[in-house]
Each structure stands twice: as C-alpha cells, then as structure tokens.
C-alpha cells in the first residue's frame, strides 16, 4: 500500500496538497454561524444526489409527470424517502442560504476586498430561488401548473420585451409541454451546472482571501 501511495506522492505531491488544506488559519472569532455556508453546500449535494436518483423514474411530459411522481412515492423502492429528503433539503437549503446572507451582511463580510465573493454569493442566491421555481412545477399537479402560469406571466408587465420574454419562458403562447421541458432542463442541467461553477468561484475566493475579520 505504501508503494502505491509513494507512486502517487512522487507525481502529484499529495501530502503538500493535504497540508495546505488542513493547515489553513482559522480566526479565533469564528463561531457556529460561520458554518451556514457549508450547511448550504451540504444541502445542495443532497439535492444533487436525490434529484439524480429520481431522474430514473420521473418522466417530463404533461401526461406522465404526475403519475411518475406517484410511482416514485408509492412503488419505487425508497422512492418516498428519496423525494421527501429532496424536498426537506430544498427547504433547508433556502433557509440556510438566507441565514448565511444575513450573517455575511451583519458581520461586514461583503466589504473590500471581498466584493466579488459577495457578488458570486448573490448570484448563488438567485440560482437557489430559481431551483425552487423550476422544481415546484415538475410534478405537474394543479399547484405546479398554476404556479408556472403565474410566474411565467409576471414578465408580461415589462414594456416592449414582456410578451416575447413570456413566450421564451413558456416555449409557446401558453403553458404546456414546452414549458415543462424547459423547466425540467433548467432544473436538472442548466441550474446545477451554473451553481457548481459559481460555488467553485465562491470557495476559491474564500480560500484565497480567508474568512473576514470581526467588525
């Protein structure tokens, strides 16, 4: 086993990387409230895992979406548990994100030189809200349908570009299969990819600049 480790160590300098990760200075003022961002990340990872599991059974069509969710809840092995954990962790992710934003704001963590860290955090907050909007529609029940209809109708009030923007969101003049397909694509591919990219940027900047000091 040591020979295998030595082989990788010689080429990748694993020990140096491990030392850099584990020896990072943590300021003495850091408390449990500084863990809220990490909890938000944990919730996101749970979302990815449980969401991926449900894609094996979910069918993104207006005729089969609701029945496929019912199948997950009643027939698929541990499907009810996976979907429930997905919903609970979604609520927890939103709550932890809000508390994290408040903590950063109240402790002045957005000030120079951490402005870009704050900007990426705001983008992540918007992406998190977008997860909620797109995911809410996927069961395609009465609540999901009317929620999508209302949300996608909001841009209608914008002058000039309102109507084209509504049609872009819905995929057609009215809410239907095109809308569900777009929301499913956003929820399972576009938003997770963007979130992963901005999280990486967020953490790299925190790693580079360190945790902000006390007020």
Curated annotation (Swiss-Prot):
Signal peptide: none annotated. It is a multi-pass membrane protein. Its main location: plastid. The keyword DNA damage does not apply. It comes from the Eukaryota. Heme b 1 binds at residues 100, 202. CDD domains: Cytochrome_b_N. Heme b 2 binds at residues 86, 187. It is found in: Plastid, Chloroplast thylakoid membrane. GO terms for cellular component: chloroplast thylakoid membrane; membrane. Its cofactor is heme b; heme c. Binds 2 heme b groups non-covalently with two histidine residues as axial ligands. NCBIfam families: PRK03735.1. Heme 1 (or BH or b566) is high-potential and absorbs at about 566 nm, and heme 2 (or BL or b562) is low-potential and absorbs at about 562 nm. PANTHER family: CYTOCHROME B. The 4 large subunits of the cytochrome b6-f complex are cytochrome b6, subunit IV (17 kDa polypeptide, PetD), cytochrome f and the Rieske protein, while the 4 small subunits are PetG, PetL, PetM and PetN. The complex functions as a dimer. Component of the cytochrome b6-f complex, which mediates electron transfer between photosystem II (PSII) and photosystem I (PSI), cyclic electron flow around PSI, and state transitions. Belongs to the cytochrome b family. PetB subfamily. HAMAP family: Cytb6_f_cytb6. This is Cytochrome b6.
